[in-house]
């Protein structure tokens, strides 16, 4: 079964917002269900501009509790009370995420008419499970506890071989559908036919990874390996490795090195330093593309469709 999967860049900036560059936030839409990664200032604005239905947000994944990644969260929580919402909202993040949510609710005297479930994490683990996918967190190295995330789908069934089914005397119709659903059937001759007899090898699902803020770590490549879409901070240009390491951030070339080593399909740089104009960001893009050609620049309201690997 084909399921649509799209990524929306709601904010691509780091540290401070700019008129054309909201703070970091990325949203994934999978068959109508929404998952938000960070909620920087301006997240609501991009949601509205893209006509995304915020009440469909099932979970929010927070990388860390620096202001440029969470200041958009209180507004989202209040906004969700303005629409009919019956499902709980999950918020996953490092230590102090729950404190931030509870303090915001108390100080702002929020009216919340739905359940909020906060889970704090400090070590790699699966933090959210769907019917056929999961979200996993892993540790980064920043100035305070920080997590990266991957959303990974289960493998899909292989391609159905109608000729094999015919050779096994399985009549076309409902029985073919059952085989494709993983259910054994009886042939016209009364013989049990198993799905593996008519289905090709399993096909991989899709994987999306989100990494910011962190200094360069070789271990990140293993976590994001084979991602179909990799969103990674590229805060500084080549030559600023020392400054980046001191501030526990990465350069665009370091991000590209991870993408290359992890064999991802496409990487989008994000969390740019406000020192760079849009024109100057093109220089960072070229530097990254010399290491990993399949690199693009994030920009606010960018939508990236994520196709299956066939």
UniProtKB/Swiss-Prot annotation:
Positions annotated to bind Zn(2+) 2? 68-69, 213, 271
What InterPro entries is this protein classified in? Answer: Metallo-B-lactamas (IPR001279), RibonucZ/Hydroxyglut_hydro (IPR036866), RNase_Z/BN (IPR013471)
Residues the record marks as active site: 68
Residues that bind Zn(2+) 1, according to the entry?
64, 66, 142, 213
The free-text cofactor remark is:
Binds 2 Zn(2+) ions.
Keywords (alphabetical) are: Endonuclease, Hydrolase, Metal-binding, Nuclease, tRNA processing, Zinc
**UniProt-listed Pfam families:** Lactamase_B, Lactamase_B_2
What does this protein need as cofactor? Zn(2+)
Q: Does the keyword Zinc apply?
A: yes
Q: Which GO terms describe its molecular function?
A: 3'-tRNA processing endoribonuclease activity; zinc ion binding
EC number, UniProt record: 3.1.26.11
Top-level EC class as recorded in UniProt: hydrolase
Which reaction(s) are listed as its catalytic activity?
Endonucleolytic cleavage of RNA, removing extra 3' nucleotides from tRNA precursor, generating 3' termini of tRNAs. A 3'-hydroxy group is left at the tRNA terminus and a 5'-phosphoryl group is left at the trailer molecule
Q: Which family does it belong to?
A: Belongs to the RNase Z family.
Q: How does it assemble?
A: Homodimer.
Its function, per the record, reads: Zinc phosphodiesterase, which displays some tRNA 3'-processing endonuclease activity. Probably involved in tRNA maturation, by removing a 3'-trailer from precursor tRNA.
> What is the recorded name of this protein?
Ribonuclease Z
Gene source species: Treponema pallidum (strain Nichols)
Instruction: Give the gene name.
Output: rnz
């Amino acid at each position: 079964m084909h399921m649509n999967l799209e990524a929306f860049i709601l904010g691509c900036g780091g540290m401070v917002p700019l008129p054309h560059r909201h703070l970091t936030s990325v949203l994934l839409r999978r068959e109508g269900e929404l998952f938000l990664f960070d909620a920087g200032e301006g997240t609501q604005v991009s949601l509205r501009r893209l006509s995304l239905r915020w009440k469909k947000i099932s979970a929010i994944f927070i990388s860390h509790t620096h202001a440029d990644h969470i200041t958009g969260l209180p507004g989202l929580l209040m906004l969700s009370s303005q629409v009919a919402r019956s499902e709980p909202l999950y918020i996953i993040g490092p230590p102090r995420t729950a404190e931030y949510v509870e303090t915001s609710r108390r100080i702002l005297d929020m009216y919340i008419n739905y359940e909020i479930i906060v889970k704090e994490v400090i070590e790699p683990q699966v933090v959210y499970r769907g019917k056929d996918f999961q979200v996993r967190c892993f540790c980064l190295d920043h100035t305070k506890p920080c997590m990266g995330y991957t959303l990974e789908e289960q493998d899909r069934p292989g391609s159905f071989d109608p000729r094999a089914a015919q050779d096994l005397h399985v009549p076309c119709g409902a029985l073919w559908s059952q085989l494709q659903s993983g259910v054994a059937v009886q042939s016209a001759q009364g013989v049990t036919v198993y799905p593996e007899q008519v289905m090709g090898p399993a096909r991989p699902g899709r994987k999306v990874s989100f990494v910011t803020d962190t200094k360069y770590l070789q271990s990140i490549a293993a976590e994001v390996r084979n991602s179909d879409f990799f969103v990674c901070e590229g805060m500084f240009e080549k030559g600023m490795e020392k400054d980046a390491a001191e501030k526990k951030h990465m350069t665009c070339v370091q991000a590209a090195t991870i993408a290359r080593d992890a064999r991802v399909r496409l990487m989008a740089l994000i969390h740019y330093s406000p020192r760079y104009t849009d024109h100057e960001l093109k220089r960072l893009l070229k530097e990254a593309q010399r290491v990993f050609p399949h690199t693009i620049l994030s920009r606010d309201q960018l939508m990236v469709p994520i196709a299956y690997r066939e």
